[in-house]
Amino acid sequence: MRFISASSLLLALAPTLNAVPVEVAGSAQGLDVTLSQVGNTRIKAVVKNTGSEDVTFVHLNFFKDAAPVQKVSLFRNGMLPNLNLATTEVQFQGIKQRLITEGLSDDALTTLAPGATIEDEFDIASTSDLSEGGTITINSNGLVPITTDNKVTGYIPFTSNELSIDVDAAEAASVTQAVKILERRTKVTSCSGSRLSALQTALRNTVSLARAAATAAQSGSSSRFQEYFKTTSSSTRSTVAARLNAVANEAASTSSGSTTYYCSDVYGYCSSNVLAYTLPSYNIIANCDLYYSYLPALTSTCHAQDQATTTLHEFTHAPGVYSPGTDDLGYGYSAATALSASQALLNADTYALFANGTYSSLLSFVNPLLTPDNSCQPQLLDARTCNRQFGRSTSCKVYWKAVE
C-alpha cells in the first residue's frame, strides 16, 4: 500500500475486478425492481415496495444514488446457453463506498408506502466498458439496509427482472466515463499532519485485527466462523484466512504494495454519509472527512464501526490485495449474516464484522464491561495465543495477569 504525497504522481493501473451477482430468496416483504431500456445503454429502474408496510431504506449504494456505484450486474452471453458460451460478467469500473450506520442524514433515506415506487435512470456505459457492443444481460438483486430513527436496523431484499439489450458499440464508446483517474502529471493532496497520524494508527490496528482474524478463521472456533461465513469447510476457512493475511500484509507497508491510499477525497465522491470508498478497477482507496471525525480509531463494541475495520473493509474490495475483490452484498451484521456461504465469502462487511467480532470477543472476556451490549461471545484464549494474535497489548497483559 502506498500513501500519495504532494510530490507523487498517480499512475494508471490495470483493471482486474470481477464482481459476483447476489442470489436472494424470494420474500413477501421486499422491493421489486423493474429494469427497462430507454436508450442504447441508458437504463430505467422502477423500485416498488411489494410489502404491506411502509419501509425506509438507505438509497446510497442503491438506486437513486448519484455516485457511480454498482446498481446492476452486466453479463455477456447470458442469453445464449445453447451455444455453450461461458457467461462473463462485465467489469464494473465505478466506486464502492462504506457508509455510516447511525446518524444517517435524511437525504440518504427513502420511504416507500406499500405499492409506492421510485424511479432512477442511469447509463451503464459510464461505469463499464461496453465499447465492443453486442448482447448484454442485466439484472440486480441483493439486500438493502433499512432504518429506524436514521439508524440501520436490518435489511430488505430486492430483486429485478432479467433484461437483455443489444448495445451499439460506437454509441457506447462515446459515453463519458463517470470515474476519471487523475492525470499522470497531476499532483495530489499530501497525506500529512493529524490525518497521516490517524491513518498510520488505523493501518497498524488493521494489521493486528486482520492477523488475529486470519488465525481465528484458520484454526479458531468453528461455530464463530459459521456465524459469519455460513460454513465450516476447510477450503473456505483457508480462503478467508488467506484474504485476511493479504490485507495484513498490504496494511503493513506504506511504501510498497498493490494499492494507492489517499487521506482525502481526491475524486469528490464523499458525501455526508460516506466514510471511505474504493475504486477496485484501479486499486485506489480514499478516506472521507467522516472517517476522521465520526469513527474511533478502534472500537470495543461488538459489530460497531471504527477506522481500522473501515480500512480493512476497503482493502478487501481491492483485487490487487486479494483476487477477486469483494462486493457489498450485505451491509451490517443482520444483512451480512443473512447471506449464503458463497455470498459471504465475497462480502466486504463480513470480513470487517468477523475481524471486529474476534477482537471484541477477546475484550469481553478480559473485561465484560467493555462490551455491555455485545452479541460477540467471549472466546477463551491462553496468554500465548493472545499475544500471537494481538501482540503484547494492554488487553493481553490484563488477560495474562488474570490467567497466570
Curated annotation (Swiss-Prot):
The active site is at E314. One of its GO terms (molecular function) is metalloendopeptidase activity. One of its GO terms (biological process) is proteolysis. Disulfide bonds join C191-C263, C270-C288. Keywords: Cleavage on pair of basic residues, Disulfide bond, Hydrolase, Metal-binding, Metalloprotease, Protease, Secreted, Signal, Zinc, Zymogen. It holds the Pfam family Peptidase_M35. Binds 1 zinc ion per subunit. Its EC number is 3.4.24.39. Its cofactor is Zn(2+). Residues 1-19 form the signal peptide. GO terms for cellular component: extracellular region. PROSITE patterns: ZINC_PROTEASE (PS00142). Residues 20-185 form a propeptide. It is an enzyme of class 3 (hydrolase). InterPro entries: Fungal_M35_metalloproteases, MetalloPept_cat_dom_sf, Peptidase_M35. Zn(2+) binds at H313, H317, D328. The keyword Hydrolase applies. It is found in: Secreted. Belongs to the peptidase M35 family. PANTHER family: NEUTRAL PROTEASE 2-RELATED, PTHR37016. This is Neutral protease 2 homolog AFLA_065450. It comes from Aspergillus flavus (strain ATCC 200026 / FGSC A1120 / IAM 13836 / NRRL 3357 / JCM 12722 / SRRC 167).
